[in-house]
């Protein structure tokens, strides 16, 4: 049983100064009326208190927030008697276990979860008033004894609840134990207070005090120091503990400090790759084990290596137990499926979804539903980088040989040369129709016009002071590498969207990279045609991280570029981020990238076929594409018409299987007004924003975050993707808050210059010297002082 006193925390500032007292009690009550949602979660997640209760004020927290509390360390909810209906709602509607909801009855809260104890109002004490004397009084007021000597039977256990010994306590020893925070008892043989370890050095840190169910015995939870509790130098007065997991942890901690260099355990600690490999090996052997004996044997091996990893990283079994305790408290649990790489892949026929191809529908007032709808897929950055890093390093070190090896491995094509040099052979244009040439020529010309208009024609000059002329002028980035994805679609449009601005900006060398076709080892003739039109010098016949690495570092036949641009899958993006941060590469990138996305805002007057076609044109990019429709005052009839149009059009598309899977996680969000819809769009920051609303042009001024905007019913995203003239290389994953889409300036850098006359030096020189002196940079100051002295602009004795 815990002590009947319940410390109340109404501000976290008081916690640190009183932490040791609360730890001794083992329970705490968080004041929900004073603490914020964030403060409650911070405390319950981070602080190791066995019992964390929360007083729940009426109406302050949403259902989702309350569930989050219970899922993250709050054990019980204390509810005032007048709010009994709240308790009913939690139990009946949210399926919160009844024992975790404590309703006040006659001024008493009867806690039933984890520990059974009644807490009266007078025992709920502000943490600010908590003191050692108060704790001593509570312990002595709770425990009783029928022994003639007035001593209290005391069981001493360690932090793992293992019995160390049976001793006795007196009132004075209890007071001293609380005062010192140490294991202090009463010695019957010496007839005096006994501070454990005072002479032997085997002391104890006191962690918690509690009583048994009848309050006639005490339990001290302690952290034992040095060799053990018993005078015979064993951990327990009942003999040594069985080795077990705690014993193994103790042994490994010792081995971490003193294992010989040639020992296997030392090798494991020194070689993390070996340790990780052994954990995976033993885990696999455990899954293959049969029968009780073999299973227990393989589990023991796995525990050994897992514990070695914990010890090597300063993680204790207690830390693991705390996590298990936290998970035990959860009232909602994960689905529990294994990661795809650990389960057999179902056949394609089994993967196909069935039924109508419809979007989910949520109201804007449903905050949880909206948050789910606007949430982007989680990028497993660390896992992806773990796969990408070796590829980059191998290409960097081995050049073409590594590139050819990866092309054969990942693209299924065995090449003798990874580079196609200009002028490109005629055979690479086979299959290119005149109709396609005309379409590409029109698109190239429109993109050229729009991007040429962005090209600065004059140097920017500003005279900031008389005689101080500042200027800024553009220069092309000399060598650029343009990544053209392959995969599930041929994308000559990406080639022209990147190649044309590079040509307009007058980059000296343009290098394409695109994965070769498995059928013949070539890239599509459309991509080669665009490469020729924009003056590309080379096409690297490779994709993925290996292509990025080849352009970033250069190989025997591939020039090192200064900037890499272009979309790609998560491996391409990870590789771009890697080389951008590697000073050896000295290579920048255009922007981070994620799955393609569209947000359409439509009202009751929107053409349902137009809306459906815009949604589907994005959905066919891939199953991870983001497709969101924000409806403004849509009727039920209109919503159904849109759903029907999506279904009927989708069935006509060759990539219907991809579309079906994408639409399965896509959503219609219903708003009450245009401003609310635009606010939601700005929060999401879509790659593509389509406005299919009345007077669409009037609302463009409300757009703050978007890659590109498509205004009005007759402006489908497809036009911007191919031929209108704007660029389709746009920021995704919410990066439209910080990044622009590709443009002419993307392929340029801007250099500043200044030209200062003697008059100008006189006007700004004293300011320069003043600031330089303050910063302690005398060299900077002297560079101005010497010039001004020679010009006679300052006295010779100027300091």
UniProtKB/Swiss-Prot annotation:
Ligand binding (Zn(2+)): 618, 621, 721, 780
One Gene Ontology molecular-function label: NAD binding
Cysteines engaged in disulfide bonds, as pairs: none
Cofactor, free-text remark: Binds 1 zinc ion.
EC number: 3.5.4.19, 3.6.1.31, 1.1.1.23
Pathway noted in the entry: Amino-acid biosynthesis; L-histidine biosynthesis; L-histidine from 5-phospho-alpha-D-ribose 1-diphosphate: step 2/9; Amino-acid biosynthesis; L-histidine biosynthesis; L-histidine from 5-phospho-alpha-D-ribose 1-diphosphate: step 3/9; Amino-acid biosynthesis; L-histidine biosynthesis; L-histidine from 5-phospho-alpha-D-ribose 1-diphosphate: step 9/9
Pfam families, A to Z: Histidinol_dh (PF00815), PRA-CH (PF01502), PRA-PH (PF01503)
SUPFAM superfamilies: ALDH-like, all-alpha NTP pyrophosphatases, HisI-like
PROSITE patterns given in the database record: HISOL_DEHYDROGENASE
Region called Phosphoribosyl-ATP pyrophosphohydrolase, residue ranges: 230-312
Active-site residues (renumbered): 687-688
Regulation: induction: Induced by amino acid and purine starvation in a GCN4 dependent manner.
Keyword Oxidoreductase carried by entry: yes
Entry superkingdom: Eukaryota
Catalytic activity field: 1-(5-phospho-beta-D-ribosyl)-5'-AMP + H2O = 1-(5-phospho-beta-D-ribosyl)-5-[(5-phospho-beta-D-ribosylamino)methylideneamino]imidazole-4-carboxamide; 1-(5-phospho-beta-D-ribosyl)-ATP + H2O = 1-(5-phospho-beta-D-ribosyl)-5'-AMP + diphosphate + H(+); L-histidinol + 2 NAD(+) + H2O = L-histidine + 2 NADH + 3 H(+)
Cofactor(s) required for function per UniProt: Zn(2+)
GO CC aspect terms: cytoplasm
Region feature (Phosphoribosyl-AMP cyclohydrolase): 1-229
GO biological process, alphabetically ordered: L-histidine biosynthetic process
Swiss-Prot/TrEMBL keywords: Amino-acid biosynthesis, ATP-binding, Histidine biosynthesis, Hydrolase, Metal-binding, Multifunctional enzyme, NAD, Nucleotide-binding, Oxidoreductase, Zinc
Sequence segments annotated as region (Histidinol dehydrogenase): 313-799
Family annotation (InterPro entries): Ald_DH/histidinol_DH (IPR016161), HisE (IPR008179), Histidine_synth_trifunct (IPR016298), Histidinol_DH_CS (IPR001692), Hstdl_DH (IPR012131), PRib-ATP_PPHydrolase-like (IPR021130), PRib_AMP_CycHydrolase_dom (IPR002496), PRib_AMP_CycHydrolase_sf (IPR038019)
Note: Present with 521 molecules/cell in log phase SD medium.
Family statement drawn from the similarity comment of this UniProt entry: In the C-terminal section; belongs to the histidinol dehydrogenase family.
PANTHER family found in the cross-reference section: HISTIDINE BIOSYNTHESIS TRIFUNCTIONAL PROTEIN, HISTIDINOL DEHYDROGENASE HDH
Listed name of the protein: Histidine biosynthesis trifunctional protein
Source organism: Saccharomyces cerevisiae (strain ATCC 204508 / S288c)
């Amino acid at each position: 049983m815990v002590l009947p006193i319940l410390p109340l925390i109404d501000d976290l500032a008081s916690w640190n100064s009183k932490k040791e007292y609360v730890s001794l009690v083992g329970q705490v009550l968080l004041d929900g009326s004073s603490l914020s949602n964030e403060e409650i979660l911070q405390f319950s997640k981070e602080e190791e208190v066995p019992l964390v209760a929360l007083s729940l004020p009426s109406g302050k927290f949403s259902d989702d927030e309350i569930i989050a509390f219970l899922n993250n360390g709050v054990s019980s909810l204390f509810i005032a008697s007048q709010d009994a209906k709240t308790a009913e709602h939690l139990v009946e509607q949210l399926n919160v276990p009844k024992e975790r909801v404590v309703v006040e009855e006659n001024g008493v809260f009867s806690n039933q979860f984890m520990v059974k104890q009644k807490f009266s109002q007078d025992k709920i004490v502000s943490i600010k008033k908590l003191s050692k004397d108060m704790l001593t009084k509570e312990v002595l007021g709770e425990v009783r004894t029928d022994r003639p000597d007035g001593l209290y039977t005391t069981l001493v256990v360690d932090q793992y609840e293992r019995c160390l010994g049976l001793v006795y306590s007196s009132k004075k020893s209890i007071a001293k134990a609380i005062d010192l925070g140490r294991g202090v008892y009463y010695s019957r043989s010496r007839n005096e207070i006994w501070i454990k370890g005072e002479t032997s050095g085997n002391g104890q840190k006191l962690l918690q005090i509690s009583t048994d169910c009848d309050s006639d015995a005490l339990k001290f939870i302690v952290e034992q120091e040095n060799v053990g509790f018993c005078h015979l130098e064993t951990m327990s007065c009942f003999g040594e503990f069985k080795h077990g997991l705690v014993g193994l942890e103790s042994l490994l901690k010792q081995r971490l400090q003193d294992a010989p260099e040639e020992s296997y355990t030392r090798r494991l600690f020194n070689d993390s790759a070996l340790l990780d490999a052994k954990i995976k090996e033993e885990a696999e052997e455990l899954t293959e084990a049969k029968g009780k004996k073999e299973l227990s044997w393989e589990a023991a091996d796995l525990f050994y290596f897992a514990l070695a990893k914990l010890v090597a990283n300063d993680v204790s079994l207690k830390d693991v137990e705390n996590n298990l305790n936290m998970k035990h408290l959860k009232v909602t649990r994960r689905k529990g499926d294994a990661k795809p790489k650990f389960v057999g892949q179902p056949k394609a026929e089994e993967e196909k979804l069935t039924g109508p191809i419809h979007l989910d529908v949520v109201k804007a007032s449903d905050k949880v539903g909206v948050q789910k709808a606007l949430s982007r897929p989680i990028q497993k950055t660390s896992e992806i980088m773990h796969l990408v890093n070796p590829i980059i390093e191998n290409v960097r070190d081995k050049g073409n040989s590594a590139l050819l090896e990866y092309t054969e491995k990942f693209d299924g094509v065995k090449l003798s040369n990874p580079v196609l040099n200009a002028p490109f052979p005629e055979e690479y244009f086979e299959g290119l129709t005149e109709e396609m040439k005309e379409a590409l020529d029109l698109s190239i010309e429109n993109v050229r016009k729009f991007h040429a208009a962005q090209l600065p024609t004059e140097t920017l000059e500003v005279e900031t002071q008389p005689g101080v002329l500042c200027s800024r002028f553009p220069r092309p980035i000399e060598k650029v590498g343009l990544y053209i994805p392959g995969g599930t679609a041929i994308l000559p449009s990406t080639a022209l969207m990147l190649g044309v601005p590079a040509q307009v900006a007058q980059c000296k060398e343009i290098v394409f990279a695109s994965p070769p076709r498995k059928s013949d080892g070539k890239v599509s003739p459309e991509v080669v045609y665009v490469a020729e039109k924009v003056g590309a010098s080379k096409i690297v016949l490779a994709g993925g991280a290996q292509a990025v690495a080849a352009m970033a570092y250069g190989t025997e036949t591939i020039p090192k570029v200064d900037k890499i641009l272009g979309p790609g899958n998560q491996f391409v993006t990870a590789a771009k981020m890697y080389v951008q941060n590697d000073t050896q590469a000295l290579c920048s990138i255009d922007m981070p990238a994620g799955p393609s996305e569209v947000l359409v805002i439509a009202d009751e007057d929107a053409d349902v076929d137009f809306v459906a076609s815009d949604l589907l044109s994005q959905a066919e990019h891939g199953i991870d594409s983001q497709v969101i429709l924000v409806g403004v005052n849509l009727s039920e009839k209109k919503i159904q018409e849109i759903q029907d149009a999506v279904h009927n059009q989708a069935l006509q598309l060759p990539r219907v299987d991809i579309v079906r899977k994408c639409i399965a996680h896509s959503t219609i969000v219903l708003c009450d007004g245009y401003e609310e819809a635009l606010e939601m769009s700005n929060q999401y920051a879509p790659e593509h924003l389509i406005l299919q609303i009345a007077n669409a042009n009037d609302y463009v001024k409300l757009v703050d975050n978007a890659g590109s905007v498509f205004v009005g019913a007759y402006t489908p995203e497809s036009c911007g993707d191919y031929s209108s003239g704007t660029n389709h290389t746009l920021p995704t994953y919410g990066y439209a808050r910080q990044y622009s889409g590709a443009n002419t300036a993307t392929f340029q850098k801007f250099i500043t210059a200044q030209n200062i006359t003697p008059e100008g030096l006189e006007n700004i020189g004293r300011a320069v010297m003043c600031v330089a002196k303050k910063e302690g940079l005398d060299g900077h100051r002297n560079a101005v002082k010497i010039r001004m002295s020679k010009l006679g602009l300052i006295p010779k004795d100027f300091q």
